[in-house]
Amino acid sequence: MDSENTILSVDVEKVIRGKSPRLADRLPRFVINFIKRLIHQDEINRLLSDNRDYNGVELATRILHDLDVTYNVHYSGSRPDPSGRYIFVSNHPLGGLDGMILISYIGSHFKDVRFIVNDLLMYIRPLAPVFVPVNKYGKMRHDNTRLFQDTFNSDAQILYFPAGLCSRLIDGKVSDLDWKKTFVTKAIESRRDIVPMFFSGENSGFFYRLAGLRKKLGIKVNIETFLLPDEMFRKKGSSFDLYIGDPIPYTSLTGEHSHKEWCDIIRQKSYAARNQTR
């Protein structure tokens, strides 16, 4: 791995400047330093530096080990065929560790995995080999659009959080936001079966209270996401459960339902997987 990756892989100031040079020039130094502490920049870079010889799936596995995070996997039906092409879809309760666990587990069973992620995560360069960036807040760059399409046309297994953002407190329960139908459309187009999964876990009460307050105040920017690195480090030594349901053949996604209706049906299957393990 090159020296640039080993020295510093997350730089808040660089990220802000890359997204909005004008904002970067206006932000006082103490605000940037506060954000660095808030997202645990030094701790994240220490993790990456300690594992400088690893990237992709191996790095995700090493980070879980260093954080003493473990997980148990439960199947409710037949396991995915190692020779198949799949889109693995899951709820998104945590915003960090859930993705790491999916990369580590699915990557240990298939030789090639790709994760559809917010393009901001591409600044974590050692994990870039498994990431496929999408811009959730604006227009996608042409090269990223091409990579997105090429990934679905490839033989790589695809990991996908259809909600995009991590779960929020909805009607008193931690639940995903609305799932987007894109994965259904792409499954049909690329002839991939879909594997519904459910991931246990939730963030702190403060995270959900801040999200609720932000919404009440009419603030559109998801400021609570700045807390996600802290939520990750708070879960050192934790154990989680991953429930994997029966693969859904893309050929079964017929015109009987719209793509959005199929999306909602598969979401229900994902949440039901936790109650159907053998």
Q: What role is predicted for each listed range?
A:
Residues I63-V69, V134-M140, G172-K173:
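Short, flexible loop segments at the rims of nucleotide/cofactor-binding pockets, characterized by
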